[in-house]
Amino acid sequence: MITRSLIELIFSAASMERWNDHPRPATFTELGKQAHKMIMAWVIARYESEARGAPVDWTSLIEGGIFEFLHRVVLTDIKPPVFHKLMQNDEQRRKLNSWVADALAFNLHRLSPAFAARFRDFLLSEDESSLERKSLRAAHYLATKWEFDFIYHWSNTKSMFGIEQTRGEISRQINEHRDLRAVEEILAARELPDRDMGLWGFLSLVGQLGFQKRWAQTPRIPQTSVLGHLLFVGMMAYFVSMEIGACPRRRYNNFFGGLLHDLPEVLTRDIISPVKKSVEGLDELIKQYEKQAMEERILPLLPESWRDEIRYFTEDEFSGKIRPAGAKVPVILANDLGEEENRDSLDPIDGRIIEACDKLSAYMEASLSIRLGVAPQALADGKQNLYARFSRSVISGFPMGQLFDYFW
C-alpha cells in the first residue's frame, strides 16, 4: 500500500532548496536535481552497457536511485560537506544509514516488505563496484556540477569564501568516474565548440526543465519545476507498478516513461490544460509541433539506437501500449494492460498509470497551495476537476482514487 506520508515525503523535496548559501540565478531543488541525476544515470548506464557489452540490471539502477533519493531527503538538514565527511567514517556511516532505514521502515514495509528489505540492504552494503551504483554515483556528481556551473558563473570568486575549494572537490569526484566511457565523452563534449550536440547537449537541455515552472501564470506555493515533476511521476508510476505485480520491463517502462513523458516541453513550455482545450484542435496541433521538434532538435542528440525508445515514452504517452518483437510501430491498447500483456517480451507500458500519476502531481500542487493559504480560483477549479475525474479511478486493478482521497 502506498501511504500518504510516503507521497508527502517525496513531494517535500520540491521545497528543499539547494545551494541556499550561495548566490543563485535560479532556484535549484532536491527534487529537480534528483530527476536530472536519474536521467543522467539512464544515459551513462545505457551507453556503458552498449560500449562494453555488459548488461544493466535496470531494477537495481531504478531502485538504487530511489533509495539514494529517500536517503538524501531524510538527511536533508545535513550540509553536503558534513554529510560526505560522515559517510567516510565506517561506524558513523553504518549508524546513520541504519537510522534512515528505521525511519522509513513503516512506509516502505507498507508498500512492500521486500522493497523495504532491499532499501536496508542497499544502505548497509559496502560493495559499490557494480555498473548500476557507479552510474548513479557518476550521475550524482555530474548533476551537481551542472548546477554548480551556474553558481560559479554567478559568483564573484574573490568574494565567495570556499567556492574554489568546492569547484575542485566536484571536479575531483567526477574525474574518479572517467573510467565510465559515457562520463569521458560527456566531459570531452563540454569543452567543444559544438557542445550543444551529443550526450552533453541532451543532458544540458533536460536540465533546463528545472527552470520551467508549472502553473506559471498562477500564484502558488511551493513553486515546482517541470523537471522535479517528472521524477515524482516516475517514482509514483513505479510504486503503482509494484502494487499491481508488473513484470520487470513494464516497471522499467513505467518509471522511465514517467520520467521522460514531458521531455518535449523543454521546447514548447508547460502549456496548461485549459489553454490546450480552449480552441478545438489546438491540443492536437501542439502534439504535432512537439513531435516535429523532438525529431529535429532532441532525438539527433542521442544515439540512433535509443531514439525509438524515446518516441515510445513521449508519443501517445498516456496510452497503454505494447511493442511485440518485430512490430514496426507500437500497438495502442483500448483497455488497461492485463495479465496477457504483462510479459517482458511485449515491452508493455501503462500510459494510463503515468497519466494518473501526472494528474496526481498537479492535484497535490493545487491542494497543498490551497492548504497553505494561496488559493486562486484556478487552483480551486483544477483541484475540483481532477478529483471529479480520478476519485473513483481504478487502473489495472489498482485504486488510484485512494491516492487522490489522501489530499482532498
Model-found features: residue ranges?
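Alpha-helical, largely C-terminal catalytic domains
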Residues: M1-W408
